Structures are given as C-alpha cells and as structure tokens.
Amino acid sequence: MSRLDVTFKTLDGLTLSGWLYPAAQYGPGIIVSPGFNMPREAFVPDIAQWYQNHGITALIFDTRTYGLSDGQPRQETSARKRVEDFHDAVTFLSKHELVDPEKIALWGLCFDGNMCLAATALDPRVHAVVAVAPVIDLHGFPERRRAILELAMQDREAQMAGEEPIYLPYVNEDGTVPLGPSMGSDFWPMMTRLKIPVENRVTVQTFYSAFSWDIMTLIPYVSPTPAMMVTPENDIECPAAEQIAAFEKMGEPKTFHLLPGKGHLDWAFGDVDSVMEKQLEFLKGALNF
C-alpha cells in the first residue's frame, strides 16, 4: 500500500514533516513515534505499515529539530514542546478524510512512550494510547546530574554570548549514554545494519529539560482514556520495574502486555505479529471498530 509525504504546522509556526500511511477505508487513525533522538525512519515504518494493512491510517513524523522538520537548535528535545508536537499531529490527522476524529490513538516507543502518555493525559481528543517499553525516569544516574547541569549552565552563558550550542554524544561507541543505563555495545552495529540515519549528538539543554520532567505526575490523568503498556520482561534501558510501577499508578481502563524474555528492542525482530495482534485487539476495543 502507498505512503505519502506530508507536512503540518505547529501552534508556534514550525513545519513538521512526516509520512502518512492511508488505510483502504475511513476509520481510525494512529500516530506512531520511535523514541529519543530517532528520525522517523527508525523502527516505526514497519509498525505504521502493519496498522495500515489492518485498517488504521497511520502517521509517523519527525518532531521538531529532527530529520526534515523545522526547529533550532538541531537535535534538541524539550519534553514539553515534544508533547505539543503530538497535539498538533492529532490536529492534522483528525482533519484527514480517511480518519474518524473520534478514533485517534497514540503509539510511542521508549522516550516517546513517555511523551504519548503525557500527550494523552493532556489531550481529550486522544481516544487510546499504546506505550511500548516506555522510559519512565528521565533523571538519570544521580552521580551524573551535577556535572551535566554545570555544563548546561555554561552552555546557556555561552549561547547568550553568541556561541553555538554544546552537544553531547547520544550513545558512545561502547553503548554508554550521558545519563544512565547503557544501550548495549550492539546499538551502533544495529543502527548500521538497519540503515537508520541517527545523528550521534544531542544538545546539553536536552538533558536539562529531561531533569525537570516527571511523567509520574501525569500518569493518573491518562484515565479515563484507555491505555495499553507493552513491557519487555528483560528491558534494561527502560527498567521493566519502573514501567510496571507506572502502569499500577494508572487508572482504568488499562491493559498490560508483558513480553517474556524480551529486551528493550529485540521484540521487534522475530514474531512481531503476535505482539501487534495484542495491540490491535486492544485498539479495536478502545476505539470500537
């Protein structure tokens, strides 16, 4: 089936770029997003196409400062602004001729699982949410916080004096990251193998923003929107125990799907259909289609 290049505006005037996967008939829509520092090419095109093939019009897009979307500095994430980008994506998708605006869902992986839960808590137009391996705690290892905050304040002063933003690596060659748990030594080989064009840099202000974000304060407000959490049992990058604690704090209606023996990303390789069928079952019940 076809994929269309699309653009849409944000409330503050940026143009965001994405791909639309139109279903064969009028019905539900879903916005699918791949996670922190990832372009739209990462992981989710196959997910979007799967939903398209099962009667759901799917949208994936580059959030601000990433890929082909507007925004400066490049590779900078403000959690609050990223959530607002999801609101504006809902506005765009709700006006499409194939989409029933009363049947729009969000789907987020890792960091964007967090963002989609937040967007759902704040946007009554969202009628279901699927959070896959969502990162819950953005505060990182305590022993690293002060050094990063000191660098962030140096960066603010330098930018005020006309200097370029300071960047940190997204993931080091050995798989370690600035804030916390390692992504594993196979991270970059996997990105190369999958031909995902990831820029290995993130502004230090991104981490400053992350330190002030706490999804647990919003989790209770996801309800009454139906929510599904998909948790890989052996997730180390986004610890399964933290995901379960967030799920337990949610109100009803909610659905939990544990992926036995799976890690943060390896669930996407192998029997993906069985994972997706559970999500489709949830969405059919939540969106009534």
Curated annotation (Swiss-Prot):
Active site: 110, 235, 264
Pfam entry (one): Peptidase_S15
Signal peptide region: none
Pathway: Secondary metabolite biosynthesis
Key words, A-Z: Transferase
Domain of life: Eukaryota
Keyword Transferase: yes
Disruption phenotype: Impairs the production of fusamarins.
EC number: 2.3.-.-
UniProt keyword Transcription present: no
Entry's Gene Ontology molecular function annotations: hydrolase activity; transferase activity
Signals that turn on the gene: Expression is induced when NaNO(3) is used as sole nitrogen source. Expression is positively regulated by the cluster-specific transcription factor FMN4.
Protein family: Belongs to the polyketide transferase af380 family.
Oligomeric form and interacting partners: Homodimer.
Role this protein plays: Reducing polyketide synthase; part of the gene cluster that mediates the biosynthesis of fusamarins, isocoumarin derivatives that show moderate cytotoxicity with IC(50) values between 1 and 50 uM. The polyketide synthase FMN1 probably synthesizes two different polyketides, a tetra- and a pentaketide, containinga varying number of double bonds depending on the selective actions of the trans-enoyl reductase FMN2. The polyketide transferase FMN3 is then responsible for the fusion of the two carbon chains to produce the furanone skeleton of fusamarins.
UniProt protein name: Polyketide transferase FMN3
Species whose genome carries this gene: Fusarium mangiferae (Mango malformation disease fungus)
Gene that this sequence comes from: FMN3
